[in-house]
Design a protein with these regions (language model features):
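Ribosome large-subunit tunnel/peptidyl-transferase-proximal elements
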Residues: 12-132
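Short, Lys/Arg-enriched N-terminal segments with co-localized hydrophobic residues
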Residues: 1-13
Length: 132
């Protein structure tokens, strides 16, 4: 199975069934989830050492807010970005930024990842109503 990604070229996922399964789940989720400016889509990406989250307005195709464990405000509160504690801190600061922006609800997009561990701890810190 070949997948094309503009930033990385063509990737062969034949041997990496874990990545292929996540991408398959991601495509199914994205068919049903859509964000607006009043209710943006909150999507997360998880790497081995960091976690990234962004609120996206799909109507205009713009990112409203983005935050990761590499952001200076998060980095000063954590020692390592790839654990549940870092995801919780990121979620708290993201929740604060969303409230400052005037967002009352979000649609949570787990991006094909299973809803446990770092993804769940980040989502639990978002106090706005969420749907996955």
């Amino acid at each position: 199975v070949l997948l094309t990604r503009p930033e990385r070229g063509v990737l062969n996922f034949m041997k990496n069934t874990k990545v292929l399964s996540r991408i398959r789940r991601k495509k199914g989720i994205r068919k049903r989830i859509f964000g607006t400016s009043e209710k943006p889509r909150l999507t997360v990406f998880r790497s081995a050492k960091n976690i990234y989250a962004q609120a996206i307005d799909d109507d205009e195709g713009k990112t409203l807010i983005s935050l990761s464990t590499l952001s200076p405000e998060v980095k000063k509160e954590i020692s390592y970005g790839g654990n549940i504690n870092a995801a919780e801190v990121t979620g708290k600061l993201l929740n604060k930024k969303l409230k400052e922006k005037g967002v009352s609800q979000v649609v949570f997009d787990r991006n094909g990842y299973l809803f446990h561990g770092r993804i769940k701890s980040l989502a639990d810190q978002i106090e706005l109503k969420k749907k996955q």
